[in-house]
Each structure stands twice: as structure tokens, then as C-alpha cells.
Regions:
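Gly/Ser/Thr-enriched, mixed-charge loops and adjacent short helices
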Residues: 1, 14, 110-234
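An N-terminal, well-structured beta->alpha segment
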Residues: 1-65, 69-71, 96, 152-182, ...
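N-terminal small/polar loop signature for handling phosphorylated ligands or for N-terminal nucleophile
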Residues: 34, 42-109, 197-255
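Active-site nucleophile and cofactor-binding loops and adjacent substrate-binding regions
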Residues: 74-83, 261-264, 288, 309-310
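Glycine-rich phosphate-binding loop
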Residues: 95-109, 234-256, 260-261, 306-345
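Phosphate-binding and adjacent anionic-ligand microenvironments
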Residues: 277-450
Length: 450
């Protein structure tokens, strides 16, 4: 069933532009309360957290108005990462955790991610229930009763408890870390404060960039989707690695001192290979359709089962839970480690990478996965472009360029108004040539149909 509001990762779009108007968020709050908080023994305790966008606190207040129609007890963690909300929701027995964020998007966009009492993102069925209630409230011309509500401030508690959790529950070698310099790109986002604190306490020598959010500079020419400046910063700091997070802190990309970009596939490879050397069990790994084929080959060679899902960390998580696996992730840098966390976590993933890369280095093994050449191309389109035009274009392009010598994924993004093309082959020339041909074909097709 196609959803009207929820995408690959929650609800996301430009704030105050339909459908994400102020009234929508009030309706959303009421719909959440009426659809997800009616079960027996529910105490209606809600936890909010947000990233640094200028609209985030306003959205928290709007959703709270709707939630308060069902007399909820609402706590506000302030600016904090998505994984920290997942952790704190479960630890402190909230019924729901709600993150106001648009992840790696620029500041004009915003949205929400919702976690259940166990710290997992709500199910597709839950999303359908919320959407159905929103439509019902719209049809009933629902008017929110003005009422006073209190937001209980838990911002200091969550930062303290999350920091302790990261440092106590992850593999660390503090004595070895003392000589390791790191450059942190904090994306002017949710980890701008706690990220620096955790890496310092873990024993690293840290230099931070993009740690001065102003409400409008989140992910702006920085963070895990913009690595252009990081190599120069690493060189200036004489760092071993640059750790680049996204705006809400649930994904990470790493750059080493030789300018090698280590994405989610490299991070998974390093963790798995380090675990094997360390005589730790790896039951299986979950990736997505975008995961580089080289990782699949390596895992099979080691006798480790590998499963692919659709793009989206929720799909990865579902498959991990179904198969009892602890490790999974996306090329984009969402790394899931269920023995530590219920959500992708940039800080935990980076700490794990650093621990296992040290083990590999001591055994004179490279942390870099020798990948098949791969290229991802994004074609952006206007928000009002009809869904059927997009679907027809993707279908026809996928059929036209089907080729036994390459792996091709063409899909509509679940988080942005764009079509993503992934071309992978053994030969780099084929990848470049086919990427250009497919891009030109899709652009011409969209122009002709719209």
C-alpha cells in the first residue's frame, strides 16, 4: 500500500509547505495519540528530541498540541541524535520516542522519525494507522482544543546517560587511542556537542569542524554527504581519520589520511574482518541492493551468510531481526549493531570501526574493501511531478539498460525528490559510460512525459 506521508525513513519535506503545514503537525500529534497510545497499560509517556534546524522546536510544540488532546506526559531531550532517542526511549520506558529531523537534508526540510517502547522504528502497519487517522481527522474537520501542557526537560540526563552508554558498551582500547588524532565533521547537527565529548573521553585527540549550528547551516557543505573539505582538514590536523556524521547522527562516512573514502560497506568489512581475527562470531550480515558486490563475495568466502534488502535501514533491521543477525548496514553509512543499539548510530559505528581497524593494522591487513567500480547518479525532479511518470520512466530505463555485464539499480529516493541510478561492473569504463547513457535517457524521458 502506497503511503501519502511516510517515506523510506519517517516523514520528511519542506516545513510549512503542503503537506507539512503547521496544522498538519497538530493533526499528526493527535493521530499518533489516537492510533498508537490506546493499548492497555499505556502510560502515554512521550519523549521528543531534535536536530539543530530552526523549525525543530516549533514542530515539537505543534505535535505536542495534538498529543495533549489525549493527555500525554511529554519529555523533551532537546538537541540530541536519533540513536540517543532510541536508546533513552527504551531505557527509561517511554511509550514512544519522536525525533524531529530531516536527517542529511538541508535546513528548510524537516520531519519526524518515531520509535516504539523497545527503541525500534515503528512498523509499516503503525505508519498506516497514523495516516488513516490523519485522513479521518481531516474529514471530521478536527479542531485541536487549546490547552496548557508541560514539556519535561531531560536534556542533561540524556546526554549524560547516552555518553556513559557509548563508553561502557562498546569495544575500546583507551591506551591505544591516546596517540590517535581524529578530525570530526559534526555537520552542524545533533552530535555537535555530545560527539566531541564522547571521542575525547574515549581517549582520542580530537579536532572538530562544523560544530557551531545556527539553525540554518545543518548539512550545509558539510557532513556525511559532503566530503569535499574533509581531506584538507585531516591533512591540517595530521589526523589518522576524518569521521563525518549526518545531521541527526545515525550515519557516518570515514576518510583516512590517504584520502580513501570509507563508506558503510567498508565499515562493515572492517568490523567483520576484525571480529574474525579477534575470534568473535559473525552469524550473518544484512545489506541492501546498493551494497557493493565485493562485500558479498568476501562474506561468502568467509562462510558468512549475506542477505540483501530494499534501501532503507528499517528494511535492513527487519531482516536482521528475522534472521537473528547482529550486524547490518547501508552503503550510505547507516550501520546497525543490534548487540549494542536498536538504531543506526554514527558514534558507535565509528568507535567500532576504529577498534577493529587497529586490530587489522596490527595484523598488517588493509581496512579498505577492494570494491567493484560503482557510480551513483542523482536526477532531481520537481515535487509536483506525477508519480506515474516517475514509475514509468524507472521501469522503461531498467528494462532498456538491463545487461549481464553490470548490476543496475534505478529507484526513486524515499527521502528526496530524485531518481537514484546505481551502476556497478568489473570495468570502470563500462560504469562511467552506462551511467551517462542512463542519465541522459531518464532526463530526456522525464522532459518528454512532463
Amino acid at each position: 500500500m502506497s503511503k501519502k506521508y511516510f517515506g523510506t525513513d519517517g516523514i520528511r519535506g519542506e516545513f510549512s509547505v503542503p503537506p507539512l503545514t503547521e496544522n498538519f503537525f497538530i493533526l499528526l500529534g493527535a493521530a499518533i495519540a489516537k492510533s498508537l497510545l490506546q493499548f492497555k497499560h499505556c502510560k502515554k509517556r512521550i519523549l521528543f528530541g531534535c536536530d539543530t534546524r530552526e523549525s525543530s522546536y516549533k514542530i515539537i510544540n505543534l505535535i505536542s498540541l495534538g498529543l495533549n488532546s489525549e493527555e500525554c506526559s511529554i519529555s523533551n531531550a532537546g538537541i540530541i541524535s536519533t540513536p540517543a532517542i532510541a536508546f533513552y526511549t527504551k531505557k527509561n520506558k517511554y511509550d514512544l520516542g519522536i525525533v524531529v529531523s530531516a536527517s542529511h537534508n538541508l535546513y528548510k526540510d524537516n520531519g519526524i522519525k518515531i520509535f516504539d517502547k523497545d527503541g525500534y522504528k515503528i512498523t509499516f502497519e503503525d505508519e498506516n494507522h497514523i495516516e488513516n487517522y490523519i485522513e479521518k481527522l481531516v474529514n471530521e474537520n478536527y479542531q485541536c482544543k487549546k490547552s496548557n501542557y508541560n514539556l519535561i526537560d531531560v536534556s542533561e540526563d540524556i546526554q549524560k546517560e547516552y555518553t556513559e552508554f557509548c563508553l561502557k558498551n562498546i569495544n575500546l582500547n583507551k591506551s591505544a587511542n591516546n596517540n590517535i588524532k581524529l578530525t570530526l565533521d559534526l555537520a552542524n547537527g545533533a552530535n555537535f556537542k555530545v560527539g566531541k565529548d564522547i571521542f575525547n573521553k574515549a581517549g582520542f585527540l580530537v579536532n572538530c569542524y562544523n560544530d557551531k549550528p545556527n539553525g540554518k547551516n545543518i548539512n550545509d557543505r558539510c557532513g556525511s554527504t559532503y566530503l569535499k573539505n574533509l581531506p584538507d582538514q585531516i591533512k591540517k590536523d595530521c589526523s589518522e581519520y576524518g569521521i563525518s556524521m549526518d545531521g541527526d547522527g545515525d550515519r557516518v562516512v570515514i576518510v583516512d589520511k590517504y584520502n580513501n573514502i570509507l563508506d558503510g560497506d567498508d565499515i562493515l568489512y572492517t568490523i567483520v574482518r576484525g571480529k574474525i581475527i579477534n575470534h568473535e562470531t559473525v552469524s550473518g550480515v544484512v545489506g541492501t541492493t546498493m551494497t557493493n558486490y565485493a562485500l558479498e563475495i568476501y562474506l561468502k568466502k568467509e562462510g558468512i551468510e549475506f542477505i540483501r534488502t530494499n534501501v532503507g535501514d528499517k528494511y535492513v533491521l527487519d531482516e536482521m531481526k528475522k534472521n537473528g543477525y547482529d550486524l547490518g548496514g547501508e552503503t550510505s553509512g547507516h550501520i546497525l549493531m543490534l548487540n549494542y543499539s536498536t538504531s543506526g548510530d554514527s558514534i558507535l559505528a565509528a568507535l567500532q570501526f576504529l577498534f577493529y581497524s587497529d586490530i587489522l593494522a596490527k595484523n598488517k591487513i588493509n581496512s579498505i574493501l577492494e570494491k567493484y567500480p560503482q557510480k551513483i547518479t542523482n536526477i532531481f525532479f520537481k515535487q509536483d511531478l506525477q508519480e506515474n511518470i516517475i514509475n514509468i520512466t524507472i521501469k522503461e530505463a531498467s528494462e532498456k539498460f538491463l545487461n549481464k555485464d553490470l548490476r543496475l539499480i534505478i529507484r526513486k529516493s524515499g527521502t528526496e525528490n530524485c531518481i537514484r541510478i546505481m551502476v556497478e561492473a568489473k570495468d570502470k569504463g563500462i560504469v562511467e559510460n552506462m551511467s551517462m547513457k542512463i542519465k541522459d535517457y531518464i532526463e530526456d524521458k522525464l522532459k518528454a512525459l512532463s
